[in-house]
């Protein structure tokens, strides 16, 4: 299932939900100035650079956790109870605790309670420091509210914790630029309550607190609780989001128009923006636009925001939301079992009346 809407600069045009992915997806054609804040000890050329960064924690909606203790590098996670009540809940760099100038992390050590599973997990592992440092050092270009393009860098290490002890780390900045660092597997542990805890420290071991958290609108929306009632925990779902990647790329068709910036969120939690100046004409067609780069595996769209100028000169903003099951089924039909041998592009077309998109 896919939903879309297009907003004009002056008039808002709501589009009826597109309840199917037609031969759309299925008809995929086979085929200067560094923006980071870093400082280095001049007396030691090998000193590790320092960046201004903080930690954010994500949990899927309906699956709250409480930390017993947690460190990301030398930075402690001060918060305890973490829960998400609205999207984006997976790959969101907002809600960080605090930022400070510090060395980037090389390891994590975290112990937490999974409320839905009623068990404790621990993850103690080295993480990919080289990848993290490269991401922070190289940064990315971003359009700021006044329309200028400026070079920015990441400012958050995002910790995603899903049922089954699944942990995904991203480098992020807000929710517009999110890049995966890696996926890690925690182990279940038998954590006993030590003596001498005060009433607050006791909460993580309290059955009463667990029931309160699982049945409170403050931690899990009522609609989510009712939808998940008597259903098993979908273990493996969050791995599925990142495991299903294919060799594909999007092509945008704007009839006699011009493409603007395109912002995308993916099901694996990553997100990014393609600036309009980075687009090229596809197959020499003036109103077909794509990013001219090597075709490589990429995750599946979750949300797409397309800005463009129509033939009339009117500017529009089109938003599309992709249903996981529908999108996954469509891609599987196209790519089959030999995913490494197939490449494809997804055609995204704006109709001439600027009222809906087709795929």
Task: Please tell me what each predicted stretch does.
Residues 283-359:
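Hydrophilic extracytoplasmic domains
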Residues 29-32:
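C-terminal motif of bacterial Sec signal peptides marking the signal peptidase cleavage site
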Residues 68-114, 263-316:
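Tryptophan-paired
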Residues 34-36:
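Bacterial signal peptide processing site
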Residues 40-64, 239-262:
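Short, surface-exposed binding/anchoring microloops in extracellular/periplasmic proteins
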């Amino acid at each position: 299932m896919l939903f879309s809407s297009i907003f004009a600069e002056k008039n808002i045009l709501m589009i009826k939900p597109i309840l199917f992915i037609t031969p759309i997806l299925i008809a995929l054609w086979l085929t200067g100035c560094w923006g980071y804040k870093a400082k280095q000890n001049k007396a030691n050329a090998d000193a590790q650079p320092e960046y201004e960064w903080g930690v954010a924690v994500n949990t899927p909606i309906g699956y709250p956790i409480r930390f017993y203790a947690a460190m990301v590098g030398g930075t402690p996670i001060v918060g305890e109870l973490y829960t998400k009540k609205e999207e984006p809940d997976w790959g969101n760099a907002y809600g960080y605790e605090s930022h400070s100038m510090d060395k980037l992390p090389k390891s994590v050590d975290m112990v937490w309670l999974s409320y839905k599973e009623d068990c404790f997990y621990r993850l103690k592992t080295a993480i990919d420091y080289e990848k993290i440092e490269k991401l922070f050092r190289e940064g990315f270009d971003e359009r700021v509210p006044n329309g200028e393009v400026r070079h920015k860098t990441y400012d958050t290490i995002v910790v995603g914790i899903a049922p089954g002890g699944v942990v995904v780390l991203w480098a992020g900045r807000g929710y517009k630029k999110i890049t995966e660092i890696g996926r890690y597997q925690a182990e279940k542990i038998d954590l006993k309550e030590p003596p001498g805890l005060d009433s607050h420290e006791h909460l993580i071991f309290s059955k009463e607190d667990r029931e309160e958290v699982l049945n409170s609108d403050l931690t899990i929306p009522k609609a989510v609780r009712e939808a998940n009632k008597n259903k098993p925990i979908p273990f493996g779902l969050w791995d599925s989001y990142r495991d299903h990647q294919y060799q594909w790329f999007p092509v945008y068709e704007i009839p006699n128009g011009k493409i603007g910036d395109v912002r995308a969120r993916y099901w694996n939690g990553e997100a990014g923006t393609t600036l309009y100046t980075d687009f090229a004409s596809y197959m020499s067609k003036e109103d077909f636009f794509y990013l001219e780069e090597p075709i490589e595996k990429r995750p599946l769209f979750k949300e797409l925001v397309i800005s463009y100028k129509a033939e009339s000169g009117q500017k529009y903003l089109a938003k599309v939301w992709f249903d996981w099951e529908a999108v996954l089924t469509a891609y599987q039909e196209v790519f089959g079992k030999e995913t490494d041998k197939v490449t494809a592009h997804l055609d995204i077309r704006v109709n001439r009346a600027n009222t809906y998109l087709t795929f």
